[in-house]
């Protein structure tokens, strides 16, 4: 370790000890060397004994700075890892830091724009930042080309070395967790840190955020539910992003929304509809929808529209994940726990050798008490949390896309019920989910699949003669192999002629299945059935030789 890393590690340890976070380590795990090490740091007592553990952890992370604050925010969404009293405290972490010098931001903008002065591209550039966070800060201006109001987001200077240095130390501490905590291995601390690192590094690339915002804007073009500000890609780079300035009411400012005459019930329901549309229609969802990133338009309060900003973190689901997730929700609310268990196995989220009966019983035990509440009071996010926590006992692998989804759903649900406490999430979401599943099966789905594949088939038409020729040639080779096997079988001293028939059929079916498996994977299960039938025939023939 470098001297700088040693100093930083010392500061981290001193901070943890001054907040009494060594209490997190169970006494049976405190070995003699650890105990001696703690006694040697006697001048670092717990100075916050009057505060609960969760609050002390939050305050310690706050003191350690931006990288640790964002790490705590990410951990607050992993309620499968922490008890509620800790997760709730981590959720209170605020990513607010002092702004850096506006003149320095101006220099960065000029460097990104080819060295020309800011005045060459923008009018009314405001040197004082509009907002500031740990990764970037925002300045206002007008585009010189058309006079439109914009905000310019600039990455903090020299932030990358700081992030890398702290991440290195977080990785070191993560490797100690399995040794110090009895449940440390299940927490998979290194994987959690790796997930955080990816999210953090992605946020440092504003070209990625620009592309995300453009995609979301395209998906909701002309939508009455959600507006994404326009991005000006010609002005964007890795360290700078320029987008339309918006004016709206923060979604957390319920008093102003009510004063503006907003239809709160419709607004809450639209939040749910926006989320499920992003997930199931678009397979591309804004995964950082906390209240600070959501506004409501002042216009048409009777027909309210959300405004979304800060698209640095997005999630996506593949077709299989979407289908299994939708069917899981519906099966759960129909209390069909057997179906829920089978879906987890079919999706590959839990190992294929999982005992479905035991898994069903575990899900029933955890989830059935939820239905003691009215449906309107059941939390979708906590349903997912209960399912995933139960599944982890059956060795469910961490699914990053589902973790993002769960986090976003908790945000959406929290905002919706803050706006309209009587919001019935299930009543709002069920028609959407049932309609989506219905659309994925039957004739409409078949026609859509044909339309999707038709261009590929047309493109491959000129190659068809060559493909047919290759198939015939491989077929000849297959026939030659079958004949050779048949001759070898005939040369054996088989006591019953019938056995030769079964052995030949078995060989033919196995070889045919193998050939189709390699050359025609689109035939689905057919090659497998042929090979299975061949093995059965072969086994019957072998038995008849005995």
Swiss-Prot record:
TM helices/strands, residue ranges: 501-521, 522-542
GO CC, alphabetical: plasma membrane
Limits of the Protein kinase domain: 124-502
Active site as annotated: 288 (proton acceptor)
Cell location: Cell inner membrane
Statement: the UniProt record of this protein carries the keyword Lipoprotein: no
EC number(s) from the headed UniProt entry: 2.7.-.-
Sites where the protein binds ATP: 130-138, 153
Entry GO MF terms: ATP binding; protein kinase activity
Example of a GO biological process term: regulation of ubiquinone biosynthetic process
Main location: membrane
Pathway connected to this protein: Cofactor biosynthesis; ubiquinone biosynthesis [regulation]
Keywords, comma-separated and alphabetical: ATP-binding, Cell inner membrane, Cell membrane, Kinase, Membrane, Nucleotide-binding, Transferase, Transmembrane, Transmembrane helix, Ubiquinone biosynthesis
Protein's membrane topology: Multi-pass membrane protein
Family, per entry: Belongs to the ABC1 family. UbiB subfamily.
Role summary: Is probably a protein kinase regulator of UbiI activity which is involved in aerobic coenzyme Q (ubiquinone) biosynthesis.
Protein name, as recorded: Probable protein kinase UbiB
Organism: Escherichia coli O1:K1 / APEC
Gene name per UniProt: ubiB
């Amino acid at each position: 370790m470098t001297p700088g890393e040693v100093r930083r590690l010392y500061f981290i340890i001193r901070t943890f000890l001054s907040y009494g976070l060594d209490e997190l380590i169970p006494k049976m795990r405190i070995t003699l060397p650890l105990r001696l090490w703690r006694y040697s740091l006697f001048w670092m007592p717990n100075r916050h004994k009057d505060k609960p553990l969760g609050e002390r952890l939050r305050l310690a992370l706050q003191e350690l700075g931006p990288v640790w604050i964002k790490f705590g925010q990410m951990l607050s969404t992993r309620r499968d890892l922490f008890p509620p009293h800790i997760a709730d405290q981590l959720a209170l972490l605020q990513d607010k830091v002092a702004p850096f010098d506006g003149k320095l931001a101006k220099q960065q903008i000029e460097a990104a724009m080819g060295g020309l002065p800011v005045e060459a591209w923008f009018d009314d550039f405001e040197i004082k930042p509009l907002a500031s966070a740990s990764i970037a800060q925002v300045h206002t201006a007008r585009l010189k080309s058309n006079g439109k109001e914009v905000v310019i987001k600039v990455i903090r200077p020299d932030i990358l070395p700081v992030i890398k240095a702290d991440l290195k130390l977080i990785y070191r501490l993560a490797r100690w967790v399995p040794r110090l905590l009895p449940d440390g291995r299940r927490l998979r601390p290194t994987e959690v840190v790796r997930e955080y690192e990816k999210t953090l590094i992605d946020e440092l690339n504003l070209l990625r955020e620009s592309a995300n915002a453009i995609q979301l804007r395209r998906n909701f073009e002309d939508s009455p539910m959600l507006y994404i500000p326009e991005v000006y890609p010609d002005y964007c780079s890795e360290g700078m992003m320029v987008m339309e300035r918006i004016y709206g009411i923060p979604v957390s400012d319920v008093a102003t929304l009510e004063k503006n005459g907003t239809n709160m019930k419709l607004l809450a329901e639209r939040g749910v509809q926006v989320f499920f549309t992003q997930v199931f229609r678009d397979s591309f969802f804004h995964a950082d929808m906390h209240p600070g990133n959501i506004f409501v338009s002042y216009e048409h309060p009777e027909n309210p529209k959300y405004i979304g900003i800060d698209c640095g973190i997005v999630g996506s689901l593949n077709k299989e994940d979407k289908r299994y997730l939708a069917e899981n929700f519906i099966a759960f609310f129909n209390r069909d726990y057997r179906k829920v268990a089978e879906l987890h196995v079919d999706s590959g989220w839990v190992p294929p050798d999982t005992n479905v009966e035991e898994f069903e019983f575990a899900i029933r035990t955890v989830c059935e008490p939820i239905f003691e509440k009215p449906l309107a009071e059941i939390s979708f996010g906590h349903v997912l949390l209960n399912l995933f926590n139960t599944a982890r006992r059956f060795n469910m692998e961490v699914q990053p896309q589902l973790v993002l989804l769960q986090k976003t759903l908790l945000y959406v649900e929290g905002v919706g019920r803050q706006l309209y406490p009587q919001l019935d999430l299930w009543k709002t979401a069920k028609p959407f989910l049932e309609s989506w599943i219905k659309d994925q099966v039957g004739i409409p789905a078949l026609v859509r699949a044909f339309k999707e594949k038709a261009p590929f088939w047309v493109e491959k038409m000129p190659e068809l003669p060559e493909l047919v020729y290759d198939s015939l040639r491989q077929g000849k080779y297959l026939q030659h192999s079958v004949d050779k096997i048949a001759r070898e079988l005939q040369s054996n001293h088989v006591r019953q002629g019938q056995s030769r028939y079964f052995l030949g059929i078995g060989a033919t079916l196995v070889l045919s299945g193998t050939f189709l498996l390699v050359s025609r994977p689109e035939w689905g299960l057919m090659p497998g059935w042929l090979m299975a039938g061949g093995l059965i025939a072969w086994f019957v023939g072998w038995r008849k030789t005995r």
